[in-house]
Regions:
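N-terminal secretory signal peptides that target proteins for export/translocation
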Residues: 1-11
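Short, Φ-rich (hydrophobic/aromatic) sequence segments
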Residues: 4, 21, 306-307
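Serine/threonine-rich, low-complexity intrinsically disordered segments
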Residues: 7, 17, 29-30
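Bacterial N-terminal signal peptides
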Residues: 15-26
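Exported/periplasmic ABC-transporter solute-binding proteins
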Residues: 30-118, 125-127, 132-142, 149-346
């Protein structure tokens, strides 16, 4: 008897888990509720603070030795950096401040904040339970639609959220299983989903497509670690499908013809229709946040003023960035805990 490879064992595990979820759904909910059972958590409880020891609580903000004479140290995720960096530089010049800006990821932001090595951290996901450090406050600056996109040669222009979940789980395996706008069918070739399963312990983002990584069980699934790799795979593969904010696509490929990708409508709605994202018709999005500290030896008044300034500037930002600002989110009935977005509208 042949030994099963670790990849095959992983695939079997994912498939069994997915079948268990479907079986549970089929016996407990109506058909039109199925999608919500596969959707992951949107936010974490804001009042549940992660415990740290006494030495950590007493520790002041201390910059890394490579950073000299800074008034502020900021670390931003790769989604916020291209938007916020020029605004911060302008603010620093106008106010005579020396501000050190680091481009990283949510994980890098979390690491620097847990070391108390930064005044402000930037996230592209809602905070996970371990991100909620004592004295750390989250300030949402906007949300951005997470687009499903395919190679520009693909004739498909729309999928339902149910079909998207079936594609990434492997239940739909060929493009011919999905009707296109003209009434015909796509290629009979295998769909090749591409997934970037980052920030696994933080809610929102890809968890809104499928709740956990084991549900991404398509046999032809390819995992990538970087946004550029995601875009490159789909640019070069007519059978591929992936997801990301289209702002990220435009950042790495300013010339749309170079990226060779196009966004699909989801449930008939486009990623660039803010009203449909706000009312819940478009169900996939990122939550963009900044942090500040409150408390003795950790609070920096420059940080509070800068975060307020950035929030105001993003209210007026060009629509090409695809960010829906806080004022519109509040007006649409989304829930906030202080300045932190913490719930979708009912």
């Amino acid at each position: 008897m042949k030994m099963l490879t670790s990849r095959k064992l992983r695939l079997i595990k994912r498939t069994l888990l997915y079948l268990q979820v479907l079986l549970f759904i089929g016996t407990t909910v109506h058909a039109n509720d199925t999608n919500e059972e596969l959707r992951g958590a949107t936010f974490t409880e804001p009042t549940k603070i992660f415990e740290m020891d006494t030495d950590w609580l007493k520790k002041p903000i201390t910059y890394d030795t490579s950073i000299e004479n800074a008034d502020l140290v900021i670390t931003l995720g790769q989604h916020l950096y291209p938007i916020a960096e020029p605004i911060i530089k302008k603010y620093a010049k106008e106010h005579g401040l020396k501000i050190f800006i680091n481009e990283g990821t949510c994980g890098i932001s979390a690491g620097m904040l847990s070391r108390k090595a930064a005044d402000i951290g930037g996230y592209c996901c809602p905070p996970g339970e371990t991100d909620r450090l004592p004295g750390l406050k989250f300030h949402t600056v906007g949300i951005a639609a997470l687009a499903l996109f395919v190679n520009h040669s693909n004739p498909l222009d729309n999928v339902s959220i149910e079909q998207a979940r079936q594609i990434f789980s492997g239940e739909i395996s060929r493009w011919s299983e999905i009707k296109i706008a003209s009434g015909g069918k796509g290629s009979n070739k295998l769909i090749q989903p591409v997934a970037r399963l980052h920030c696994k312990l933080r809610p929102g983002h890809w968890h809104l497509l499928l709740a956990n990584e084991d549900l991404f069980s398509s046999p032809s699934l390819q995992e990538v670690g970087a946004i550029q790799d995601m875009i490159s795979q789909i640019s070069n593969n007519p059978m591929a499908i992936g997801y990301e904010t289209m702002t990220s696509v435009h950042r790495y490929y300013p010339n749309e013809n170079e990226s060779k990708v196009k966004a699909l409508k989801l449930n008939g709605y486009s990623h660039n229709e803010p009203s449909e994202l706000l009312n819940g018709n478009y169900p996939l999005y990122r939550t963009l946040s900044l942090t500040t500290w409150e408390g003795e030896d950790i609070q920096n008044s420059h940080a509070t003023k800068l975060v307020n300034y950035l929030t105001q500037q993003i209210e007026q930002i060009d629509s090409k960035f695809g960010i829906v600002p806080v004022s519109q989110i509040r007006k649409a009935g989304w829930k906030f805990y202080g300045n932190e977005l913490n719930g979708e509208p009912e």
